[in-house]
Amino acid sequence: MAERFVVTGGNRLSGEVTVGGAKNSVLKLMAATLLAEGTSTITNCPDILDVPLMAEVLRGLGATVELYGDVARITSPDEPKYDADFAAVRQFRASVCVLGPLVGRCKQARVALPGGDAIGSRPLDMHQAGLRQLGARCNIEHGCVVASAETLRGAEIQLEFPSVGATENILMAAVVAEGVTTIHNAAREPDVVDLCTMLNQMGAQVEGVGSPTMTITGVPRLYPTEHRVIGDRIVAATWGIAAAMTRGDIAVTGVDPAHLQLVLHKLHDAGATVTQTDDSFRVAQYERPKAVNVATLPFPGFPTDLQPMAIALTSIADGTSMITENVFEARFRFVEEMIRLGADARTDGHHAVVRGLPQLSSAPVWCSDIRAGAGLVLAGLVADGDTEVYDVFHIDRGYPLFVENLANLGAEIERVCL
């Protein structure tokens, strides 16, 4: 049944919130279990819609998947199927991450082109090019990525852009290829590091983890393992930005602040007091936020997933800010909804200029993707009156217990069935 959120603005948020495992990590870890026959256990899984969706994809490939609490127990068969059908894959983008493991383990794959968030073009060109360099034939046929190989052999691979998805798919095929693979301009995101950590626990030989140059020495086989998902830095930062916007005081636990240094620096520039420990941070804002300029970049830059929240923050900041989107070209669709809330914002190509106002005004708004939805809810927290946010299933795909956590922090928010 379709649902909406009703957000009443004006409340100051305060308290403590613990984040779960990272959405951008857990789905790839689940896919990686296909590389090893037997049962792997993944803990600290977030309570989000995409986890059971990925479980369905894996079941369709012959795996047995048990989900209980924050644990996923996945048993990969001795001969996985290699055809990921459209019905399961179409619902979310990360489903394409089964491509690399299937090519690595089965030497063939047929994966329907995925669905997911409407944030711009995200072609699979680099995924295909990397697999071809490993010796696979890889093409788009009838709406599917079709790949096959007699043997995979290590290669020197230069990525045009440090794509997270391409890095991960190439990596998961290369760990069982013959010889040595070097990925130049590899993605350095904490989620990629988390995947490498699990693969090495399974018996892979991956070096240069977290650096732009990754070296993989192929091994004949991998083995099941148990692994704990890292904390979700995007969810954690969302709570930190919510504190800054509402002039609140929120402690966020369960995440490594080292994964968010630039974001926390920007919050400090906006006037927040930021303190950190090894696995937590606290954001306290006592006055109206100051304007800040933000440019999204691959890690360790400012995450593109937090761009909508940055626009929401600057929409009520003192001064004029420029937000530059360097990763996804269509992510500024979110600005149209912010304008409905009274934001003074305009876009020009990859740039958005936002002139901060003392307060936004309530209006009905629609989510186009996970992060845009979270940004709209944050905007509703500082709007005058009741803001109705529609298509909130997007938010449920990436934020566990979103309404409950906000309510515990002092927000006035309600989930309503349409």
UniProtKB/Swiss-Prot annotation:
Organism of provenance: Mycobacterium leprae (strain TN)
Return the protein name: UDP-N-acetylglucosamine 1-carboxyvinyltransferase
Q: What does this protein do?
A: Cell wall formation. Adds enolpyruvyl to UDP-N-acetylglucosamine.
- Catalytic reactions of this protein: phosphoenolpyruvate + UDP-N-acetyl-alpha-D-glucosamine = UDP-N-acetyl-3-O-(1-carboxyvinyl)-alpha-D-glucosamine + phosphate
Residues the entry annotates as binding phosphoenolpyruvate: K23, N24
Q: Which GO terms describe its biological process?
A: cell division; cell wall organization; peptidoglycan biosynthetic process; regulation of cell shape; UDP-N-acetylgalactosamine biosynthetic process
Q: Which family does it belong to?
A: Belongs to the EPSP synthase family. MurA subfamily.
Q: Tell me the GO molecular function terms.
A: UDP-N-acetylglucosamine 1-carboxyvinyltransferase activity
